[in-house]
Amino acid sequence: IKNMISLMPTSFPKKLLKNQEIYPAKGKKIARVALLTGCVQKEISPQINESTIRLLNRHGVEVVVPKKIRCCGSLNHHLGKNEDAHSDFTNNIKTWYEEHKKGNLDAILSNTSGCGTTLKDYGFIFRWDDDLKKKAKKIEQI
């Protein structure tokens, strides 16, 4: 742990974007996507999410970052905190499902590899829960 602590930054980058749910497209809107910002990345390297949002906006993509999305759940899952992980998974599935019904998402994007991998497993994780499995499969198809 001592070696890992030495790798931690002594200060964190300043966040440049406002904490909002909708980042509108510049010019003609051609798509609407949700972005999973990641619980660690948005604190350690917020410039990655900020650059992603600016790039998408510049190319006519509206970006939705739902405030209800806390974490993809993989961190809790890897730490063995299964109840917390399942709470994160369930929250995300329901939030994105409702967001899609509300305004038709063209995609759910993650620029964090661990989160992206976890999202693809939601349907499998809830294979015994018909309602969540159906919603998770819909989310996977977006």
Language model segments and positions:
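Iron-sulfur cluster-binding electron-transfer modules in prokaryotic oxidoreductases
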Residues: 1-142
